[in-house]
Amino acid sequence: MTVEQNLEALDQFPVGMRVLAVDDDQTCLKILESLLRHCQYHVTTTNQAQKALELLRENKNKFDLVISDVDMPDMDGFKLLELVGLEMDLPVIMLSAHSDPKYVMKGVTHGACDYLLKPVRIEELKNIWQHVVRSRFDKNRGSNNNGDKRDGSGNEGVGNSDQNNGKGNRKRKDQYNEDEDEDRDDNDDSCAQKKQRVVWTVELHKKFVAAVNQLGYEKAMPKKILDLMNVEKLTRENVASHLQKFRLYLKRISGVANQQAIMANSELHFMQMNGLDGFHHRPIPVGSGQYHGGAPAMRSFPPNGILGRLNTPSGIGVRSLSSPPAGMFLQNQTDIGKFHHVSSLPLNHSDGGNILQGLPMPLEFDQLQTNNNKSRNMNSNKSIAGTSMAFPSFSTQQNSLISAPNNNVVVLEGHPQATPPGFPGHQINKRLEHWSNAVSSSTHPPPPAHNSNSINHQFDVSPLPHSRPDPLEWNNVSSSYSIPFCDSANTLSSPALDTTNPRAFCRNTDFDSNTNVQPGVFYGPSTDAMALLSSSNPKEGFVVGQQKLQSGGFMVADAGSLDDIVNSTMKQEQSQGDLSGGDLGYGGFSSLRTCI
């Protein structure tokens, strides 16, 4: 066959494909031959498997495809399949009347490219040429790089010449793909050979701990532990990792135990510690900023070293800060109308730190604590028998002011218009008689003797009509408003006063014609215990609170400090006694109408 014939046959492929048909049944062999010829294939037939094998061995390049029956007397079709596949490397199609999957599987595993059932159809035979093309492609992949060519003629030579141009590149690519497949297989094998992960169960951990205890914590090594445990499939690396985790666990446990021991030892030092008192056996230094039981609850300071202005909350007892307790007692017997000069007192820091150190503290109440209980006992029978008085009283002893039972800052508070106290009937007659005789005997009689504890010189105030913690009010008032005594405007406008005769002046006084008492003046009886009126509302903590008058106005805002009031009051003249300006409204008593 010339080259031109080879090229022509290549262009007409699969026409002229060479097929070898083998079957012991003559009828089936004739039908198969006719069908193959109808498909324009070149057919060679034989009824013996051994003869077919000889034909193939004589010229292996003479045929392109082999069709063989499975059941043959001289040789099994599967045996022929193996020999052809090993010697000639040709595609073989198995033909059988058995459709059992076992036969099909056996044929495929032995190298058959297809499995056809009898009777064979022409449609199946028309597509058998694809097996030839596939086998040639496989041959090209398996050929060497030197370009060896197989000897042959016909269509096979034409097919080889068609693929000579890209043979080198295909070989390199196929070799690269084969190398990748081999590497992938090696990786799969290595993954399959990986050791399984060790799970430390309770029993395994117990063996580990027993081995560590037997060797000792310091001498426990992974190799020795592994030998003592004697567990299958347990490596030294597994034991070393678990030993490291075990040591970290023991270190953490020991740290927690040491911390608990330190805390247990230090509990004794904190047993005597209070949240606000600190350590009981150690005094708190001055300026520590910590409150404790011995110090006052709060010390306030006035600006510029004075007691503060009357109508400003910047002095002592700022609103909502602190207020004096109800029923505070005086320490000595002093007349009600007599004022003493208030000077700056030395600070006492013996009982604790002051939260406002370095600032002027004109009032200090710590010095009044010593005689507090004594003054209570002495004045228990002479205390006021009521809730409180309408106006506050003032008293001093040396450098101290007023003793508060709970060491709160004492403030001078302005009170709303309150109801005047009622006097008991069994004592008011004695006092009216005493005061009437005293006034009628002289125009300016001497004041009652000091340190007098007689019952005639004592006020007893009955409880108010409404016993409740609300601010006291004047219930019975006339059209004219009432102002507390010692008004700043009154004291500044009054002439000098003889301080030897202490009297109390009121702007609003009214006496009946039958009392024989000089209007505008009365003698303040000496007393041992007087109570200051405390505001029921703790937020009413002014120096002298802004007292709203019934007429709709307020007190003078620039009346001056308390020091100015005290000094001006001491200079008032005794002759200025007529301070008419309103009726206090003592409706219950016709013989005496005055303010206290």
Swiss-Prot record:
Tissue: Detected in the whole plant. Predominantly expressed in leaves. Expressed at the root transition zone.
UniProt KW keywords: Activator, Cytokinin signaling pathway, DNA-binding, Nucleus, Phosphoprotein, Transcription, Transcription regulation, Two-component regulatory system
Keyword Ribosomal protein among UniProt keywords: no
Region of interest called Disordered, as start-end residue ranges on this chain: 138-192, 437-467
Main location (coarse class): nucleus
Residues annotated as signal peptide: none
Comp. bias (Basic and acidic residues): 138-153
GO process terms (BP): callus formation; cellular response to cytokinin stimulus; cytokinin-activated signaling pathway; maintenance of shoot apical meristem identity; primary root development; regulation of anthocyanin metabolic process; regulation of chlorophyll biosynthetic process; regulation of cytokinin-activated signaling pathway
Subcellular location: Nucleus
DNA-binding interval(s): 197-247
Biased composition (Acidic residues): 177-189
One Pfam family here: Response_reg
Species classification: Eukaryota, Viridiplantae, Streptophyta, Embryophyta, Tracheophyta
Function description: Transcriptional activator that binds specifically to the DNA sequence 5'-[AG]GATT-3'. Functions as a response regulator involved in His-to-Asp phosphorelay signal transduction system. Phosphorylation of the Asp residue in the receiver domain activates the ability of the protein to promote the transcription of target genes. Could directly activate some type-A response regulators in response to cytokinins. Involved in the root-meristem size determination through the regulation of cell differentiation.
Location of 4-aspartylphosphate modifications: 69
Domain Response regulatory intervals: 18-133
Gene Ontology cellular component list: nucleus
Protein name (record): Two-component response regulator ARR12
PANTHER family, alphabetized: TWO-COMPONENT RESPONSE REGULATOR, TWO-COMPONENT RESPONSE REGULATOR ARR12
Family: Belongs to the ARR family. Type-B subfamily.
Amino acid composition bias (Polar residues), ranges on this chain: 158-167, 450-459
GO molecular function ontology, one term from the record: DNA binding
Record motif Nuclear localization signal, residues: 194-197
Free-text description of this protein's post-translational modifications in UniProt: Two-component system major event consists of a His-to-Asp phosphorelay between a sensor histidine kinase (HK) and a response regulator (RR). In plants, the His-to-Asp phosphorelay involves an additional intermediate named Histidine-containing phosphotransfer protein (HPt). This multistep phosphorelay consists of a His-Asp-His-Asp sequential transfer of a phosphate group between first a His and an Asp of the HK protein, followed by the transfer to a conserved His of the HPt protein and finally the transfer to an Asp in the receiver domain of the RR protein.
